[in-house]
Amino acid sequence: FNQYTYEPITVILAKNLVGYQFSKGFEAKESIAELSSYEAGSKVIPYVVLGSVQGKDLLGFSYEQLLPYALPAENPEKAFVVIPGDFVTTEDGTGIVHTAPTFGADDAKVAADAGVPAMLVHDDRGNLVPLVDLQGRFRPEMGEFAGMYVKNEYYNEGEEPERSADVQIAIKLKDGDEVISAL
């Protein structure tokens, strides 16, 4: 169950991190039937491990875009797909990461090798541009985040919003049942 919305969810997680991710406030159960006694808001959330797969078996699977404000201008049908990356390990994290080919060298290389497009949109002159402008603000395509600086440090003193864009995005994802943990 999602710890924020209490709705049933299915999670894919590196096997050796199950104990870490589901340590505090969670309790392992043996069967799905044992989940029926869960009540929203309970201090202990039950979970069941349904099975396991190798990461390589997930390659090529597509997934839903978490913030569907814009699609890449080029080859959008090739976006949002599971691809391999030799820099992704369970020693340094979950073994599953979101790539941002527009903003990182490793991500750009692995995405290009797999044919995954960068998240670039056309500006009013037809140029391909990222969803964050050169001043560090979200572009108009970003809905309610349009015009906000990515980080509050970019605002003039006293002009920053109470909650930074990253915090507002995390809240939106939690409210939409899209997050199991926000670090």
Task: Give the ranges of each region predicted by the language model.
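Non-cofactor substrate-recognition interfaces
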Residues: 1-183
